From Swiss-Prot:
Forms an icosahedral capsid composed of 60 subunits, arranged as a dodecamer of pentamers. It catalyses: (2S)-2-hydroxy-3-oxobutyl phosphate + 5-amino-6-(D-ribitylamino)uracil = 6,7-dimethyl-8-(1-D-ribityl)lumazine + phosphate + 2 H2O + H(+). The active site is at H89. Pathway: Cofactor biosynthesis; riboflavin biosynthesis; riboflavin from 2-hydroxy-3-oxobutyl phosphate and 5-amino-6-(D-ribitylamino)uracil: step 1/2. This is 6,7-dimethyl-8-ribityllumazine synthase. 5-amino-6-(D-ribitylamino)uracil binds at F22, A57, Y58, E59, T81, V82, I83, F114. It comes from Yersinia enterocolitica serotype O:8 / biotype 1B (strain NCTC 13174 / 8081). Its EC number is 2.5.1.78.
């Protein structure tokens, strides 16, 4: 039986981070967590990390797609925060961001890590950006690194 598992130490990985500016008071913490995980745990160098700011979570799939198509990156990490309000806007933005990023991953053959918080409140978002519930930006970075190695192992 063959078992393929990825490791997170990936010193030569080239990683792009697409991050939404909207809700940046939360997203800045997600970015800090992602960069810390890439550098400290993944051993990725500054030169191999590219950060691209976009207006909001809805724009993340387009930019992730463009980044993936450049063939300059081994993975893309998407970071953002969508907080439920009093209208259906939350469902549209969260759903399209999720489905769009999934589509990019499926069509590009590189990992697209989903670090977009979809929360009921600002408090929940803050908890997931580095307080009570860990840092989902760091988790997305570790997912991206592990998936880079899983895909490399599968392809041989």
């Amino acid at each position: 039986m063959n078992v393929i598992e990825g490791v997170v130490a990936t010193p030569n990985a080239r990683v792009a981070i697409a991050i939404a500016r909207f809700n940046n008071f939360i997203n800045d913490s997600l970015l800090e967590g992602a960069i810390d995980a890439l550098k400290r745990i993944g051993q990725v160098t500054d030169d191999n990390i590219t950060v691209v700011w976009v207006p909001g979570a809805y724009e993340l799939p387009l930019v992730a797609n463009v980044l993936a198509k450049t063939n300059r990156y081994d993975a893309v990490i998407a970071l953002g925060t969508v907080i439920r309000g009093g209208t259906a806007h939350f469902e549209y933005v969260a759903g399209e961001a999720s489905s769009g990023l999934s589509s990019v991953a499926m069509n590009s053959d590189i990992p697209v890590a989903f670090g977009v918080l979809t929360t009921e409140s600002i408090e929940q978002a803050i908890e997931r950006a580095g307080t009570k519930a860990g840092n989902k930006g760091a988790e997305a970075a570790l997912t991206a690194l592990e998936m880079i190695n899983v895909i490399k192992a599968i392809k041989g």
